[in-house]
A protein has these predicted regions:
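Active-site core of PLP-dependent enzymes with the aminotransferase class I/II
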Residues: 158-181, 188-194
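Conserved PLP-anchoring active-site segment centered on the Schiff-base-forming lysine
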Residues: 98-116, 134-135
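Buried hydrophobic positions in well-ordered alpha/beta secondary-structure cores of metabolic enzymes
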Residues: 25, 73, 91, 106, ...
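Hydrophobic beta-strand scaffold residues
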Residues: 131, 182-183
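PLP-dependent aminotransferase-class I/II
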Residues: 118-170
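Conserved small/polar residues in nucleotide/adenosyl-binding loops
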Residues: 196-203
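Short conserved active-site loop signatures built around small residues
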Residues: 2-31
Length: 203
């Protein structure tokens, strides 16, 4: 029998592994407004920077407040982990740049938020990443657009402004066939549309 998933409201408040502040035992998550952290010594610092040991190095890399947020968002979405960034366009950029480089291409849905179209057209193109567009009304259009340089499919769950539901399963099945990941912008339906089934599928 599978373990019952907590309600989203419970996960939002208690998700992740945070229970209380180790210094004060306060149950509310503190807002750490620091940029730097004190090391226990030179060996401790060296281990952190060499990534031999997990811990706080610099707030742009890791912050205890962000850590709690990321674990809770991952729990809400049913994902394995999460990275918080300052905007949706940053998230889209990170996702694409994680898998593609100059000379590669991404096959994207034609139904896209205007800001994403600008990102793809004016920014990623300058980095040598080609964006090919496929009409999602027929998922086979994604398969027709790929070649050996295709590094990802891209779509929006409920695209702005059309709100035509993206065929997630059909396109992800094509991606599995060719070992191409599907990057989804889930801005319009977070928590409601769970794109991952592990580690905690919604009942």
């Amino acid at each position: 029998m599978s373990k019952k998933r907590n309600n989203p409201e419970t996960i939002a408040i208690h998700g992740g592994d945070y229970r209380s502040d180790p210094a004060t035992n306060a149950v509310a998550v503190p807002i750490y407004r620091t940029t730097s952290y004190q090391f226990q010594g030179t060996e401790h610092a060296a281990n952190l920077f060499a990534l031999k040991e997990f811990g706080n190095i610099y707030t742009r890399i890791m912050n205890p407040t962000n850590d709690v947020l990321e674990k809770r968002v991952a729990a809400l979405e049913g994902g394995l982990s999460c990275v918080t960034v300052s905007s949706g366009q940053t998230a889209s950029s990170f996702a694409v740049l994680n898998v593609a480089q100059s000379g590669d291409n991404i096959v994207s849905s034609t139904d896209l938020y205007g800001g994403t179209v600008s990102l793809f057209t004016h920014t990623l193109s300058k980095l040598g990443i080609e964006i090919r567009y496929a009409d999602p009304s027929d998922p086979k259009n994604f398969e027709k657009a790929i070649d050996d340089k295709t590094r990802a499919f891209y779509g929006e769950t409920l695209p702005n402004p059309y709100l035509r539901v993206f065929p997630i399963k059909e396109v992800s099945d094509i991606g599995r066939k060719y070992n191409i990941p599907l990057i989804m912008d889930n801005t319009a339906a977070p928590v409601i549309c769970l794109l991952y089934t592990s580690p905690s599928p919604r009942d």
